[in-house]
């Protein structure tokens, strides 16, 4: 493995690890506040699955504790979607549906081919299938429930839709469209996956087209069965597509990070 390839593997591991870490923390905020005890257990299990994934991925990029607790906000590479506040229960479910559908499709691809993420993906895809199915069942229940639950679920789907396009931006070290990037491609590309002349490298998809299409098909099917309308707004982040992957985050992320890192930073170098 060349230095360039290793660097890009680390970058991909960091981004995917940050996704899992941040969403795990968000779901953990529900502990003691979930609507029923059964859901308390379900959300805790999903959070723990994601935390386990985060530990493996962050360890591929460096020291897991240092990366989780000692980086500043701009150094995190997670999607803006996963950092969004829990809001009401419908918002949490919509966020989980969008992300778990993407994560399941991604890990299924990674598990099916050789590479540094194949082992993790083979295990994680089974966990994520449960996460996706759990979110799907709640989407159906809320969307096809009372007038109020339908309204809240639709509002949540609409509000989070603009963060979904970022999931399908190119990510160094990952092959999203099945064609792959060789080491020459990696050497001549920018962090956003484009050539240094601003174009997409030959043999790559600038927006993970196949993955995006499969995600849209799956989400549209769930929303349709739930009696919910597919949001029609733009699918870009708060400032620009790919903002979270570039270290640009929404306001609420800074507050979440301060809470998550408080204990570790309060006792630097302590042994636990």
Question: What are the language-model segments listed below?
Answer:
Residues 81-137:
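Internal, conserved structured core segments that host functional sites
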Residues 9-13, 34-53, 92, 116-128:
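Alpha-helical scaffold segments that form or flank carboxylate-/histidine-based iron centers
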Residues 150-187, 192-272:
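Extended, helix-rich structural scaffolds rather than catalytic motifs
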Residues 19-27, 53, 57, 99-106, ...:
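Amphipathic, well-ordered alpha-helical segments in soluble domains
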Residues 14-19, 63-76, 225:
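Acidic, low-complexity proline/glycine-rich segments
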Residues 47-71, 135-139:
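Conserved alpha-helical segments that form or flank metal/cofactor-binding pockets of metalloenzymes
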């Amino acid at each position: 493995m060349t230095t360039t390839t290793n660097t890009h593997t680390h970058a991909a591991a960091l981004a995917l690890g940050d996704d899992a870490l941040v969403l795990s923390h968000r779901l953990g905020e529900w502990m003691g506040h979930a609507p029923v005890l059964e859901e308390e257990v379900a959300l805790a299990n999903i959070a723990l699955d994601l935390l386990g994934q985060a530990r493996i991925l962050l360890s591929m990029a460096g020291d897991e504790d240092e990366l989780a607790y000692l980086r500043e906000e701009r150094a995190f590479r997670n999607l803006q979607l996963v950092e969004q506040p829990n809001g009401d229960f419908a918002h949490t479910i919509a966020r989980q549906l969008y992300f778990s559908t993407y994560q399941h499709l991604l890990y299924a691809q990674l598990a099916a081919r050789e590479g540094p993420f194949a082992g993790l993906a083979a295990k994680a895809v089974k966990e994520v299938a449960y996460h996706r199915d759990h979110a799907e069942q709640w989407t159906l229940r809320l969307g096809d429930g009372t007038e109020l639950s339908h309204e809240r679920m639709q509002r949540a789907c609409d509000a989070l839709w603009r963060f979904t396009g970022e999931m399908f931006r190119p990510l160094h070290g990952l092959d999203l469209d099945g064609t792959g990037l060789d080491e020459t491609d990696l050497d001549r590309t920018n962090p956003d996956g484009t050539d240094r002349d601003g174009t997409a490298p030959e043999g790559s998809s600038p927006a993970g087209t196949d993955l995006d299409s499969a995600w849209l098909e799956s989400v549209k099917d769930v929303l349709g069965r739930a009696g919910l309308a597919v949001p029609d707004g733009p699918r870009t982040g708060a400032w620009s597509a790919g903002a979270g992957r570039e270290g640009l985050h929404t306001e609420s992320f800074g507050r979440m990070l301060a809470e998550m890192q408080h204990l570790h930073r309060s006792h630097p170098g302590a042994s636990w």
